[in-house]
Amino acid sequence: MMKRIFWHIFFLTIFLTILYLPVINRIKAVPPGKTYTKVHRIFEDYYYYLSVIRQGRGNWAEVDQYTTEKTNPSRVHLFYLFLGKIARITGISDSDAYYGAITVSLIIFYFYTCRLIRLLLPEKWMIPTLLIIYLAAPLPDFTFYLFDKKITTTYGWWTNTDIYHRLSLIPHHFFTGALLIGTVFYFILYLRQKKIKPAIICGLITGTANLFFAVPGFIFLVSVIAACIIFPAIIYLSAIKPLKKNKIQVFFNRQILTGLIIILALSVLTQAFVYLQLKLLGHPWSDNLIWEYNTYHAERFPYQFFIFLSSYGILPYLMIILFVNTILKPTFEKIFLLLIGMMPTILYLLSAGGILTINKIRFVYGAPYVFGGIAAIMAIRLIIGKFHNKLIPALFLFLLFLPNTFISLKNYRERDVKITNYNNNEFIPTIYFEAADFLNGNTEEFSNVLIPFNIGTLLPAYTHNKVYIGHEVSTADFWGKYALSNRFFYEKDMNRDEVQKILGNNRIEYVFWDSGPLPEIYSEFMAPVFRKEHIVIYKTKI
């Protein structure tokens, strides 16, 4: 027992260190006159989620603060509204609630990973499996040509499979990924016990996950349906004729079918609820799925499938061994495990091919290293079983994983731990927060502010105002507005009619100016109400 506790503490300490070391390093190095906002991953998304947490302190619905258009309040980001309630009750800051959610998700992720390993593998394989799941890494960067096409394998900003990003996913992605592992655990437990209780728990967990982020639940749902089709097909094609019908009937008995109906019903209903939420809430949510799909479709991001595949490192190649074994000795468990490990890749290809209108890069969220790592260990056990000397293949496979782990940790140090730029969206001049305090104390809630894009991403996280532009997904005609914003603030070439139009059509009440001298034409439409160094906030006269 003490040995097991030691290893759990050991692993969690390593994981939490990897998660928080970049943050601690930056807290210690904040330049004078600047504030470190603890930006996590993509700064636009981070500030957006902070704005929802901020609203969640007092509301059960969010107003889109990243557009000046009229939008319906929504509960699309229900996870962050919950975090807002927790932050209000506990008295912690929005960013602390955000990082607290990552920490809790990491612990749940680890807990269900251990339970799933213990369910599927002998106890002695626990530590090797954890090492592969958490320390294996994507393939290193390299480029080659295939039929005159340049193919690059590297970890992309969207794959999330390098060591650091695997342990610090965006909170709702991480939390639902952790619940996905719990869902798989109870699903396999149900298959073994043939009792309804694990099936109900499985359905409730996947249903809960769907309400927060539907992609992991969708991967699970499709994997279960595919396994229910593929398993009897393999049995029918491979079994001795008198046993075919009997073997299929024994597995799909009344108890199994009842549990499957419960699991699938809860999963489908919650998936449908989330989809209807997006469709019924109006802009921008009703167009979100199509916008994402069109933006990240294959023509705009060609050949990324190779990056997606290489992001799994050597795991897919070990899974091939288990795949062959499963064809020869099929069981529903092995088929399902292979499917849920491979399903993100299959769905990615369906999306890239135009068959499935869901953003293809969404399918990185499915805990692939957990299922792939367990499948890899199963394959390794098969390999080792063929040798009289067990040490040689074990050592070979260990050395196979080691270089990638070393490269990934080196990349983590260079890309994430080291500070390479102090003039970015992490270290914000403190005067911008003084301007935010002014807006909070002197403007009406959800009043519209015209602001440059780079500051528009930040402001809603710290004020109650709506901004003209700040996030690609949250406003109509983003690129058109982006061009107009650049003309207004940086090119400063708008005539009187254009200034009146951008202020009037968007019901702009305040202008946040940090772009040097104000053009004379602009001054006809606004008057200063706040001034601090190079920042001026104007009240419009429209």
Predicted regions and their residues:
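Active-site lumenal/periplasmic loops and adjacent helix-entry segments of GT-C-fold
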Residues: 17-181, 208, 212-218, 424-426, ...
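Membrane-interface transmembrane helices that cradle and orient dolichyl/undecaprenyl
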Residues: 175-198, 235-238
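Membrane-interface alpha helices of multi-pass inner-membrane proteins
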Residues: 185-186, 198-216
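Transmembrane catalytic cores of multi-pass membrane glycosyltransferases
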Residues: 211-338, 345, 355-358
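Signature aromatic-anchored transmembrane alpha helix within multi-pass, membrane-resident enzymes
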Residues: 254-268, 381-413
